Amino acid sequence: MNKILSLFLITILLISKVMSSSEECKLCTDFMYDSLNELIEIAINGGVIGSCGALCNKLGIAPLCMVCAIACDAVGINGFMDLLQDVFPDPIYICESVKMCQYNDKANATITEVVINPMSGNVGDTFKIGVSFNVTNTIATGEILWNVVDPRGFQFGETEVIIDAAPSIYGAAFSFQATPSEQEEFPPGEYQLQMQICEGTCGSPHPHSYILSNQYLNFTII
């Protein structure tokens, strides 16, 4: 389903008060990851903005404007602008600040296994990554982060948001294709896979953000 249509339908549920807290948080984080840079640009270059409506309507797409207005109204236009103009704008922290996501400063989790296949491969191969982790105290809103460091020290990776992960064993899978590009040449040598589980955003300086567990694994591209 088109992401904009999905946001519209979810927003209707939110307004009608039938959305769970986890669904509300996902709505906010999806919106912030997609629209944060545009909102920052509007906040910096949009002139005098005196209301949440004036800010959010500049997004130009009704579902995005609706989610923006819900978040902005929770803290007021001045509070929302402060969040957008922070030195380290953080989608999860913003969603927590506008009360659309929860946090748990006692969250606890341990990575139990990280695998990559193949352990030694060629340029052009697809590398599959797997991670298992044990949550022993609920992760309210956090991330799985994987990062690959090449032999020259350049990095690439992705994150996946975790919402309301109650104590249990969890797993996730990722992949990347080692196809050279302007961003990553994939030189031959030893690479390091870095895996982190976090409450909040991994590496964020904001409150309620910290690394719960990390693990490293080396692999080779020939």
Swiss-Prot record:
Disulfide bonds join 25-101, 28-95, 56-68. Glycans are attached at residues 108, 134, 218. Keywords: Disulfide bond, Glycoprotein, Secreted, Signal. It is found in: Secreted. GO terms for biological process: sterol transport. Residues 21-105 form the Saposin B-type domain. SMART domains: SapB (SM00741). InterPro entries: SaposinB_dom (IPR008139). GO terms for molecular function: sterol binding. The keyword Protease does not apply. One of its GO terms (cellular component) is extracellular region. The keyword Secreted applies. It comes from the Eukaryota. Residues 1-20 form the signal peptide. Belongs to the countin family. May control the size of the multicellular structure. This is Countin-3. It comes from Dictyostelium discoideum (Social amoeba). The gene is ctnC.
